[in-house]
Each structure stands twice: as structure tokens, then as C-alpha cells.
Design a protein with these regions (language model features):
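Glycan-recognition and catalytic cores of secretory/periplasmic carbohydrate-active enzymes
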Residues: 1-461
Length: 461
């Protein structure tokens, strides 16, 4: 959150850093990277803040700093998605795929030209603030492949009284950037990548109380559904470009699963049932991607003969996370989250139970690979936690009290669904929390302290 991977001026994150100090990035910004980091930052902000409440001294301060940094990074990603990746279409604005690393300077294409600053430009933005700029806070790291230019980041967490001048500096740097030629944007609207962003924005809207994030998620979701879903065929186009969907290029399993997850999260955040209904339709088609004989998910319903031959006629999707979550694991997660939402709503059916079992089977490889390659099975591990946890959702006696909102935020950060049940017994002044798994519920516990005690006992883990 401090280093050069993050764009501290306009928000958002680059793909990776090119130096051992994490001070200079490869400047390309991808939609899916920022979607994943938005979810991580929003959850980290909530959980770190709760940890700070329960801690003292230096540990509490470090947790509080992490919560602040994570919230700042999440807001930066929201701003980046809205200001730099949202397409200009008035009819169907959605998220473009990426921003290039290169842009023009003095007639030449240079990596990072839009983002970096020369010594003269650094002096231009810092000199008016020089008396108030704190020492040991700012870092201008030299860019090896672009001599005499520097990348801005932070060396430490700013003190409360330093934030104002830091914002002034950022505004000055932003104004300077606006005089430059922007990097080229890849205008393709990819269904699955937008689904990941919609899911992350919906989570952030709830966790950080960010209505603008929810509005942005709804805008993109409406556009992708309107533009890329073929109502007559019941098919999803993988890509649209300039308000035209390529309906001859059906989405992959990854597109169906990721967009379904986005719609499920959006329905939960907005309270609008249409999104869960649309997610169900996407999952209905996604089921056709599972080989009926082997039960193995495939990239496409009909295997490409050339690809199948290279794979010994097995057209399975990858089971390992890479730059993107594994398609099979995303599908398993979508099935599990759909089932959990049904549980919390009191509508759990045999079909939901079957979907939950399918999710368990599709993610079972994570248990064998976790010790050797945890990052490559992270999505599948998340699914295993969902399906095996003794607590899958919570019922709350209160909904809008300050403590109830805290419980809801912590629950969502941990992947738990929540429902309102005012009939729960207990003291009226304290929120009562009932942990449940499928259709079986435990005795309620009182307040946030009771919930943490439950988790500490292992009964909620």
C-alpha cells in the first residue's frame, strides 16, 4: 500500500514492480488486477480496524495504520475505475480491459511517461509546499529505463497532521499529469473481467459505506447485461467493443462464473432481486460447460478440435489460479455463493444443496495442493472454507444499529452471508447473533465480543 505498485496520484495499481524495492512498477494497469486488489483492500480495512479495537499500544497503532492505508487504496481503485477505465459510451458504459504502460513524450512512446516526473517537475510541485512537506515521507525513485525521471510513492504512513499537505501535493501532481497525453486504453469490454470488478465494487460499497461504488457497479452490470446477454439464445458474448457485442464469440466458463459472482454481490449490496435472478440464468448456462460424463468443467461447451488434440482430447479448464482466478474455481465459488444466499434467505432447496456439493468437489484439489502452492489454489481454498465452515451465515436481531453494521461488515469480510431475524431472543439493547450452517443454527451469542469468542473457540472457524 505504500510502494510504487500503487499509483498514489490517480489511484489504482500497476501489474507488478520491476525493482527489488517495489518502488518502480511496470506501468500497465489491468482491470482484473484492480478488481482483486479492491476486494482485498476493502476487507483488510474492516478487519484491521477491528483488530485495532481489540489491541493496545504499538500493535493497535500498526493495525490502525493498515486499516487507513487499505481504505485509502480501495478509494483510489474506485476512483481509477470510474475516471480512467469506465468507457465513454453514453448508452452502455462499462469497464475497459486495461491502460497501456507506454505513452507519448516528445514524439516518442516511453513506458511510464504519463506517470513519472523529472527533477524540474518535482521542484515545480513541491517548492510551493516545501515548508510544510514532512521529512521522510515522500519517495521519488529513479526509473532505470527512463533516466532523469522518477516514480512517486511513500516511505511511511503519514501522520494525521500530514495528510492535508499530502493531498495538496497529489492535486498538484494530478494537474501536471493532465497536461500530458494519456496512455492508450484497451476499449474491449470483457464480461468476466467486468464481473470481477462488479463483485469488488459491490463488496466495497457495503464494507466502506461507499454509495458511489454501488452506483458504479450497477452502471457496469446494467451495461454488460444489456449489451452482451442474448435474451433469445440465452448466451453471453465474451466481448463487446464500441457498443457492439460479438455474439458469435460466446463467453468462456470464466466469463459466466465471474459475471454471476458480480451479480450475486450486487444483488446483496443493492437489495434488487433482479441481479440474483440474472446470476441464476448465467449459472444455468454455465452448467452446460461441465462434461456430463466426467463432471469436469470445460473452457467451452463445444471443444475446439485442435485444442482438444493438444490436451489428449480433454477440454478441461485450468484448476490453478494465475493472473486470473481459475475458471473451475470461480464456477465453484459462484455455485457456493448462490447456495449461501439461498440459505440466508430461507429458500435453501435440494438443488442448492447439490450445487454446494458440486462446489466442494470442484475445489477439492486445493486440499492436496495448498501446502506446496497456496497462491495457485487460493480461489479453490476460499471455496473449501465456504463449504466446510461450521458457520456459513449469521442471523442478526438488529440490522441498522451501529453494532449490527459492524457485525455485518466483519461477516462480509469473512465471506459470510447475513440475514435479519428480529425474533431472536436476548437483551434488546445488544445485537443477538445466531451462527448457522445450511438449515441448522446454533444458540445466539451476544454482540461482537460474543462473535469473536465463538470464532476463537473454533466453533465458528
Amino acid at each position: 500500500f505504500l510502494g510504487g505498485l500503487q499509483d498514489h496520484v490517480d489511484g489504482g495499481f500497476a501489474r507488478y514492480c520491476v525493482d527489488e524495492n517495489w518502488s518502480v512498477p511496470h506501468f500497465e494497469k489491468m482491470l482484473y488486477d484492480n478488481a482483486g486488489l479492491l476486494s482485498l483492500a476493502a476487507r483488510t480495512s474492516v478487519l484491521a480496524a477491528e483488530f485495532a479495537r481489540k489491541s493496545e499500544g504499538e500493535i493497535a497503532q500498526r493495525a490502525q495504520n493498515l486499516a487507513w492505508l487499505a481504505q485509502r487504496s480501495a478509494q483510489g481503485i474506485i476512483d481509477f475505475l470510474n475516471e480512467e477505465l469506465l468507457t465513454a459510451s453514453s448508452a452502455a458504459p462499462a469497464f475497459a480491459a486495461s491502460l497501456d504502460a507506454d505513452s507519448s513524450r516528445d514524439g516518442r512512446q516511453i513506458e511510464g511517461a504519463y506517470y513519472t516526473f523529472s527533477r524540474e517537475q518535482i521542484a515545480l510541485v513541491t517548492d510551493p509546499l516545501i515548508q510544510r512537506l514532512p521529512k521522510g515521507l515522500l519517495r521519488f525513485a529513479p526509473v532505470a529505463e527512463d533516466p532523469q525521471n522518477f516514480c512517486f510513492s511513500l516511505l511511511r504512513v503519514p501522520e494525521t497532521n500530514e495528510i492535508g499537505v499530502l493531498h495538496e501535493l497529489r492535486d498538484a501532481m494530478r494537474t501536471l499529469r493532465r497536461s500530458r497525453i494519456m496512455p492508450v486504453r484497451d476499449e474491449k469490454v470483457i464480461a468476466g473481467w467486468n464481473g470481477l470488478a462488479i463483485e469488488a465494487l459491490s463488496e466495497a460499497a457495503l464494507l466502506l459505506d461507499q454509495p458511489e461504488a454501488l452506483a458504479l457497479a450497477e452502471k457496469a452490470a446494467t451495461s454488460v447485461w444489456t449489451m452482451q446477454w442474448d435474451e433469445n439464445a440465452g448466451r453471453l458474448a465474451r466481448v463487446s467493443f464500441a457498443n457492439r457485442a460479438e455474439h458469435g464469440n460466446e463467453g468462456t466458463l470464466q466469463d459466466y462464473a465471474a459475471l454471476a459472482l458480480g451479480f450475486l454481490a450486487l444483488g446483496q449490496a443493492s437489495g434488487h432481486k433482479q441481479w440474483a435472478e440474472r446470476a441464476s440464468r448465467l449459472l444455468g448456462r454455465a452448467a452446460d460447460f461441465v462434461d456430463p460424463e466426467t463432471g469436469v468443467p470445460r473452457d467451452a461447451v463445444q471443444a475446439d478440435a485442435r485444442i482438444a488434440a493438444q490436451r489428449s482430447n480433454i477440454a478441461a479448464v485450468t484448476v490453478l489460479d494465475d493472473a486470473l482466478p481459475a475458471s473451475g474455481a470461480l464456477y465453484a465459488k459462484a455455485l457456493a455463493m448462490h447456495a449461501l444466499q439461498s440459505m440466508a434467505a430461507g429458500d435453501y432447496t435440494e438443488a442448492d444443496a447439490a450445487d454446494l456439493e458440486s462446489a466442494r468437489v470442484l475445489s477439492a484439489h486445493a486440499l492436496a495442493l495448498a501446502s506446496d502452492a497456496p497462491t495457485q489454489v487460493a480461489t479453490a481454498l476460499e471455496v473449501q472454507c465456504i463449504v466446510s465452515s461450521p458457520v456459513q451465515y449469521l442471523a442478526l436481531s438488529q440490522w441498522d444499529s451501529a453494532e449490527a453494521k459492524r457485525v455485518r461488515s466483519v461477516a462480509l469480510s469473512l465471506g459470510l452471508n447475513v440475514r435479519h431475524d428480529p425474533s431472536l431472543p436476548g437483551a434488546a439493547q445488544t445485537v443477538q447473533i445466531q451462527p448457522c450452517r445450511e438449515e441448522l443454527c446454533q444458540m445466539p451469542v451476544a454482540g461482537m465480543d460474543g462473535l469473536f469468542s465463538l470464532f476463537a473457540s473454533g466453533k465458528g472457524a
